[in-house]
Amino acid sequence: MTILSEIVDYKEQLLKDGYYHDKLQNLKGVKHKNKSRLTDALIKNDNLTLIAEIKSKSPSVKAFQQTNIIKQVSDYERYGANAISVLTDERYFGGSFERLQQISETTQLPVLCKDFIIDPLQIDVAQKAGASIILLIVNILTDEKLRQLYQYASSKGLEVLVEVHDGIELQRAYQLNPQIIGVNNRDLKSFNTDVKHTNQILKCKKENYLYISESGIHSQQEVKQIVKSGIDGLLVGGALMNCNELEHFIPSLKLKKVKQ
């Protein structure tokens, strides 16, 4: 069993146990007034759009540098991040919907609920906790379920980041005609990363979509390796969580876009 399939089994069990129903009942809810949209930033910015991530741990990293989460988000915003990504999985990533709610209340930036969504109820909880964007991972969903969840989230006014890991998944994503497609540089079996994965997958990309490179980005040099693939943005997590010089590091990642 891969780590990913283990996580999905865990989500299915949480659904059966009423975890998400309880969250929906108990979260106080966050209003979305004046939130900017990720799509607008991706389209309008001449430089790469940055989604800066908050997480405490991952299956490949036992713990990231301890920090005041609200200050971290404030620093992300101050130094040029365009959106915030929040891991809400508790067991594997040390996140929570309460953290998502807290962050959503303190920033005007769009907020991505980064989780392993397999049911509409999870989308309801994410939105109530303040998310304006949700993640759908093509690898863990059938075409029918992917379309159902995409349409459901869109009908609720949420933006959707559709994540792919290979060329076959990219073609499946195109069937939705989504605005935003994320290319994850992480190998789902080993959880190792290689940023050149973005270049390989986007060799066969279609125009008129917005592309984000996700995971494994630790330096400007790595961004230089992938910017020519035609990406519009980056999602960076671990490197930001462990960084003590965000005022320099964040601007260094936001290179000028290269459109083909």
From Swiss-Prot:
It is an enzyme of class 4 (lyase). It comes from the Bacteria. One of its GO terms (biological process) is L-tryptophan biosynthetic process. Pathway: Amino-acid biosynthesis; L-tryptophan biosynthesis; L-tryptophan from chorismate: step 4/5. It catalyses: 1-(2-carboxyphenylamino)-1-deoxy-D-ribulose 5-phosphate + H(+) = (1S,2R)-1-C-(indol-3-yl)glycerol 3-phosphate + CO2 + H2O. InterPro entries: Aldolase_TIM, Indole-3-glycerol_P_synth, Indole-3-glycerol_P_synth_dom, Indole-3-GlycerolPSynthase_CS, RibuloseP-bd_barrel. Its EC number is 4.1.1.48. GO terms for molecular function: indole-3-glycerol-phosphate synthase activity; phosphoribosylanthranilate isomerase activity. Keywords: Amino-acid biosynthesis, Aromatic amino acid biosynthesis, Decarboxylase, Lyase, Tryptophan biosynthesis. Pfam families: IGPS. NCBIfam families: PRK00278.1-3. Belongs to the TrpC family. HAMAP family: IGPS_B (MF_00134_B). This is Indole-3-glycerol phosphate synthase. It comes from Staphylococcus haemolyticus (strain JCSC1435). The gene is trpC.
